[in-house]
C-alpha cells in the first residue's frame, strides 16, 4: 500500500503521524500513511 499512499499524496511515518499531518491509511503494520493538512 506504499504506492497507494504516495498516490494519495501521503507519506510513510514510523509510529504515529505527527502534527500537522493526519493518518489516511497504513504503509505496513508499524508504519502509518500520513497526509499533510496544509
Swiss-Prot record:
This is Spheniscin-1. Monomer. Its main location: secreted. Belongs to the beta-defensin family. The lineage of its organism: Eukaryota, Metazoa, Chordata, Craniata, Vertebrata. The keyword Translocase does not apply. Disulfide bonds join 5-33, 12-27, 17-34. Keywords: Antibiotic, Antimicrobial, Defensin, Disulfide bond, Fungicide, Secreted. Has antifungal activity and antibacterial activity against Gram-positive and Gram-negative bacteria. Involved in the process of food preservation in the stomach during the incubation fast. May also be present during infection. The keyword Secreted applies. GO terms for cellular component: extracellular region. GO terms for biological process: defense response to bacterium; defense response to fungus; killing of cells of another organism. It comes from Aptenodytes patagonicus. It is found in: Secreted. Secreted into the stomach cavity.
Amino acid at each position: 500500500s506504499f504506492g497507494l499512499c504516495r498516490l494519495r499524496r501521503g507519506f510513510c511515518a514510523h509510529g504515529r503521524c505527527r502534527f500537522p499531518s493526519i493518518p489516511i491509511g497504513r504503509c505496513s503494520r508499524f508504519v502509518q500513511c500520513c497526509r499533510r493538512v496544509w
